[in-house]
Amino acid sequence: MGFFSLTQEIAVDLGTANTIIIHNDKIVVDEPSYVALDSKGKLFAVGEQAKMMHGKEHPGIRTIRPLRDGVIADFNAAELMIRGLIKMVSSKHRWFSPSLRIV
């Protein structure tokens, strides 16, 4: 990242079991690929928190594994999961949105 760069570069490795986010050549997020949605389809929990809810959901909450066999099975859930995991990336100077590299 250049001195006057207006973006933060992060890399996202979407995996069926875990999703990893790398920032500044360090793994900053390594979470299970799970998402929990409320009855309106809004994000309730992501990663480890959503995995702990799996199989124990409240009637208004459902857990989803958006990737199956290395392929995105639920695009909406995958997008919500990625957005939730990106929010976990801590940065003191988060003035600009990240530039993503998905592998």
Placement of each model-derived feature along the sequence:
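A short acidic-Thr-Gly-centered motif at the start of a beta-strand
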Residues: 1-5
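Short glycine-aspartate micro-motif
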Residues: 7-13
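Conserved phosphate-binding loops in N-terminal lobes of ATP-dependent enzymes
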Residues: 16-103
